[in-house]
Amino acid sequence: MWSLWSLLLFEALLPVVVVSVQVLSKVGDSELLVAECPPGFQVREAIWRSLWPSEELLATFFRGSLETLYHSRFLGRVQLYDNLSLELGPLKPGDSGNFSVLMVDTGGQTWTQTLYLKVYDAVPKPEVQVFTAAAEETQPLNTCQVFLSCWAPNISDITYSWRWEGTVDFNGEVRSHFSNGQVLSVSLGLGDKDVAFTCIASNPVSWDMTTVTPWESCHHEAASGKASYKDVLLVVVPITLFLILAGLFGAWHHGLCSGKKKDACTDGVLPETENALV
């Protein structure tokens, strides 16, 4: 206990040299916080602390003894090595923060190193949705305007980028929307049926990607003189229904006329029969 208080007293009263370092890692990994000191600095005592979001004692080195069994949110996830570097892990989403190691040499000189640890989530496989824009009068024939939306669920600090491949001479119009490149608008032509677009979602420590072929969502065929199956249905089905209805109407009308003629014939025969009887 006296060693701990003496180290804190050194930090408060003696000149301290501070070196700051940024460390990036991801959830589930272990990260080594390396303790570095000047050449010839022979460490006699050292103390590792978490400074933010809460100040906690993590590990100490005193008289050649390493100690890590201090009550903190890292209890059971801390290992202090002989070179005084501290390993934390497996890391959790709330482990980001500021850490410091205070070292005192055999002559009483102090050296402090602060480290900022940023823990990112691992990037999941992004989801890509394809939306087809309604055709406009000014839109060239046999082209398809699509919007590609990329999204990595349940994660922040993500940037998006796109790449495409498939047609060597692809020269369709491509525009990126939003500052993080999450939405892409693409104009496709008949020669771009096989062009595949890949969305890459990434953060500083991990990435993943998803590939789609947007022409499959355009729902039309190349205009090469052949009618598509959809176009055929649009013509054949109405004509067939019209012919069926016309046939039904003709049959009904024929039956109606036949009934009227039969009644007329019956009216003409009855008087003659009556006269013959008389």
From Swiss-Prot:
Topological type in the membrane: Single-pass type I membrane protein
UniProt cross-references to PANTHER family, sorted A to Z: SIGNALING LYMPHOCYTIC ACTIVATION MOLECULE, SLAM FAMILY MEMBER 8
Membrane side Cytoplasmic: residue ranges: 253-278
Lineage top rank: taxon: Eukaryota
Signal peptide start-end: 1-20
Extracellular side: 21-231
Disulfide bond annotation, renumbered to this chain: C150-C199
Keywords: Disulfide bond, Glycoprotein, Immunoglobulin domain, Membrane, Signal, Transmembrane, Transmembrane helix
Any one GO cellular component localisation term in the record: membrane
Localization per record: Membrane
BP GO terms, sorted: B-1 B cell lineage commitment; cellular response to xenobiotic stimulus; defense response to bacterium; leukocyte chemotaxis involved in inflammatory response; negative regulation of dendritic cell chemotaxis; negative regulation of macrophage chemotaxis; negative regulation of monocyte chemotaxis; negative regulation of neutrophil migration
Gene name tied to this protein: Slamf8
GO MF annotation list: identical protein binding; signaling receptor activity
Start and end residues of each Ig-like C2-type domain: 126-213
Presence of keyword Metal-binding: no
Regions that span the bilayer: 232-252
General function of this protein: May play a role in B-lineage commitment and/or modulation of signaling through the B-cell receptor.
InterPro entries in UniProt: CD2/SLAM_rcpt, Ig-like_dom, Ig-like_dom_sf, Ig-like_fold
UniProt key word Phosphoprotein: no
Annotated glycosylation sites: N83, N154
Protein name (Swiss-Prot/TrEMBL): SLAM family member 8
